[in-house]
Design a protein with these regions (language model features):
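FIC/Doc superfamily catalytic core
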Residues: 1-192, 196-362
Length: 362
């Protein structure tokens, strides 16, 4: 990443963290929904973020949207949930794993192909067995015979980078994620869903590195595709990675500006006694699961495994979704290493507000 971009990005990330934007209630969930919505919109979906939020949270399909659009978004949501699991567990990237991601992305909308070289099913994540082009009369992607060996080369490259991700600065993590996106979509391992899977892998790298996951904005689709095409024709990722860095910087800048503007307004959960005094709005968010988590933490600093053991939980996914994530989103629990959420040394403790709530409900 160019030095000017690097400096600007680091300043914005520092400001993002200082303001606590990522620690807002429901920020992580709603930001993920935005990422999913923009990714499917690039592929033609017209479902909005608001419609996806209602569909994901309440199971209510958006009126006036096709079944295919609904399924595309639901499939991608399941794929991102799987990616979050992989990032949290630091699972090694393998060909079966990438195929599993593709299978989730295409689960309900994938086609079955019968070719001279055999049969393959998009819904199963099968690699393509025929050649494809970007568009009618457009450039052709890698010959299908080369897809599997080149994908394995990509996997080896990516695992080598992920092995050192804890020692990387944030701009370097983003660089790796952009490069991963470029390499995978250029190989084009599947007949369909390559863009969604490539963006998912990009976000997986970002999640594993503990930086803010990036949405590729659908309103910049033309510029995004143009940057990708120019880089592919040039045989270097420089143009594409530069474009992605500029998009990230612009998105973060807008987020910070909007937050600072909105923060000037009164915030419902604050009162005259300060932010560490629980109000009805805060205590109403303390589910039985969150209450158990607060009691288990007390004055201690514990890692996720220790917390699960104290709570008698074996399901890591349920623990994260029903206990830990809700407590963090509510501002009741914080990470000891907030700039590296996926760090192996990560531990959790009560915030000042969490201590007050624990005392109030104890």
């Amino acid at each position: 990443m160019e030095e000017r971009r690097r400096i600007r990005l680091e300043r914005l990330l520092d400001e993002f963290d200082r303001l606590g934007i990522g620690r807002q209630i429901n920020y992580g969930r709603l930001h993920l929904y935005s990422i999913i919505t923009h990714s499917t919109a690039i592929e033609g979906s017209t479902v909005t973020v608001e419609e996806n939020t209602v569909m994901f949270d309440n199971g209510l399909p958006p009126i006036g949207r096709s079944v295919t659009e609904q399924l595309m978004n639901l499939d991608l949501k399941r794929a991102y949930e799987a990616a979050e699991e992989v990032a949290a567990a630091r699972t090694e990237i393998t060909l079966p794993l990438l195929k599993a991601f593709s299978s989730l992305v295409m689960r309900n909308i994938g086609a079955l192909y019968r070719t001279l070289h055999g049969e393959y099913d998009e819904a199963k994540g099968d690699l393509r067995l025929q050649n494809v082009s970007a568009e009618r009369g457009g450039r052709s992607y890698l010959s299908w015979e080369k897809v599997e060996p080149r994908t394995n080369d990509f996997i080896a490259w990516l695992n080598e980078r992920l092995a050192n991700i804890d020692s990387m600065a944030a701009p370097d993590i983003y660089d790796v994620s952009f490069e991963a996106h470029f390499r995978l979509v250029t190989i084009h391992p599947w007949s369909d869903g390559n863009g969604r899977v490539a963006r998912l892998v990009m976000n997986l790298v970002q999640m594993e590195g503990g930086v803010v996951p990036m949405a590729v904005r659908s309103d910049h689709k033309v510029q995004y595709i143009e940057a990708l095409r120019e880089s592919q024709e040039a045989g270097t990722s420089e143009r594409f990675c530069g474009f992605m860095a500029d998009e990230l910087i612009d998105a973060l800048s807008q987020t910070v500006e909007e937050y600072e503007r909105d923060a000037e307004r009164d915030v419902p959960w604050l009162n005259d006694d300060g932010p560490n005094v629980p109000t009805p709005q805060v205590t109403s968010q303390v589910t039985p699961q969150v209450r158990r988590l607060l009691a288990a933490l007390g004055s201690k600093e514990l890692d996720a495994r220790e917390l699960r053991s104290m709570l008698g939980l074996s399901d890591a996914k349920s623990f994260r979704q029903l206990y830990l994530r809700r407590a963090i989103d509510a501002g009741l629990v914080e990470m000891t290493i907030p700039d590296k959420p996926r760090s192996r040394n990560q531990r959790y403790r009560l915030t000042g507000l969490g201590m007050k709530v624990n005392e109030t409900l104890g």
